Amino acid sequence: MKRVLTALAATLPFAANAADAISGAVERQPTNWQAIIMFLIFVVFTLGITYWASKRVRSRNDYYTAGGNITGFQNGLAIAGDYMSAASFLGISALVFTSGYDGLIYSLGFLVGWPIILFLIAERLRNLGRYTFADVASYRLKQGPIRILSACGSLVVVALYLIAQMVGAGKLIELLFGLNYHIAVVLVGVLMMMYVLFGGMLATTWVQIIKAVLLLFGASFMAFMVMKHVGFSFNNLFSEAMAVHPKGVDIMKPGGLVKDPISALSLGLGLMFGTAGLPHILMRFFTVSDAREARKSVFYATGFMGYFYILTFIIGFGAIMLVGANPEYKDAAGHLIGGNNMAAVHLANAVGGNLFLGFISAVAFATILAVVAGLTLAGASAVSHDLYANVFKKGATEREELRVSKITVLILGVIAIILGVLFENQNIAFMVGLAFAIAASCNFPIILLSMYWSKLTTRGAMMGGWLGLITAVVLMILGPTIWVQILGHEKAIFPYEYPALFSISVAFLGIWFFSATDNSAEGARERELFRAQFIRSQTGFGVEQGRAH
């Protein structure tokens, strides 16, 4: 059990956050026709939305940002739909099912990055940028080098996420639907390409909104039924769970998963700053009309996500009571059928029968599609807008840029399917950890300092950004997950699971040192431009609004 918990501690914090990567052994379940029918209804409905959206996508603004006409409330729901993953739902509830109170600490830990986005990033990002966060980073710095660095940071994060998503999708669908792994991966890839290729940000937004509503409804119903079972008393919920759990009262004790304080701090920093550097999340702030709506987006999104993670805590304890103590959900060896990640799915059956089980299974699949669609659009915009239109072919027409974007969507989709098949039996949890570390070590420092530090120069941003990215990759390779578990060495060169504490420090120090020592005329000019940028970031004066965006 201790080894299982250690593995969960190493993989779930990141996998649950956004990757849908269901780690560990998966037992294929019998074909669930109710779930398949419900999922097909969702697919047909969302493809109808994609067709509707395709008729309204007439320009680059429409494709990248839905014309800037998404409201703060809608965008908040879409952000929540982009961020709340199937592994958040299944993984966190499984963590609570096995470890109790520690699951709450992890689930709430995913929210710590959102106050940073709310207070430091959202408004200025919207006022300074148009389509990608590279627009903000390059506002007063050299366009070419900064956009190349930002695009590389975005593409690496997107690529790592997509691989983890595709592998997680295949495993999850095998687990829930009883479908073949390869069929599942191809299905997700094709649907992902159709949503983004034809509907752009408008279709992606509505897929994410629908998914968020379905997931919040399903989780709310499960939590309500659990609380009804215990007379709406948390005291009864915890008492009954402690009475049937093998650990007894120990499930209410915190600190059982990450005992090393440096690892805990590094994990926390990675989650906090990584969230604020995810390209597919940052891109959503350009879909609203102004900074006020951007701020409202974060407010609503944080509320929806906070509510959802509290529900997963109730669901996890409900699973201890109604699933863990019921031999009907266990195999001959006494283990949960399908593994611990099936705890929430079994609970759906326990509280709502086969029909609700089919609904929850379909919702879990829908969450994957919503997340991969956002990732694909973020990757495509990094190539077409940042690299093609602003570096390699300046002055490209909107039509040319959109063509490159759609070609990139196809390429990303095919690559995601191929790598999803190739990585079927690999430990992909480290990819998500690495993606988070890169987002925190490369993207976040550049975004933050470009908006707030007047002495930042292109030299400092380039040196610090690349140092942060390379440090995160190297330390992850030398750490226990890759060096020992994957490459088979006896002892890790870098002793900690999570590199964020060190790679973020290297990035900020590098940016500070190389900017402070930059005495060039170009550096002086970039410092002088900060005042104009600051006024624009505060007022939004000069930024295109609404449909013009």
Curated annotation (Swiss-Prot):
Coiled-coil boundaries: none
One BP term from GO: sodium ion transport
Signal sequence annotation: none
Membrane topology label: Multi-pass membrane protein
Keywords carried by this UniProt record: Cell inner membrane, Cell membrane, Ion transport, Membrane, Sodium, Sodium transport, Symport, Transmembrane, Transmembrane helix, Transport
Domain of life per record: Bacteria
PROSITE patterns per UniProt: NA_SOLUT_SYMP_1, NA_SOLUT_SYMP_2, NA_SOLUT_SYMP_3
Protein name in UniProt: Cation/acetate symporter ActP
Species of provenance: Escherichia coli O17:K52:H18 (strain UMN026 / ExPEC)
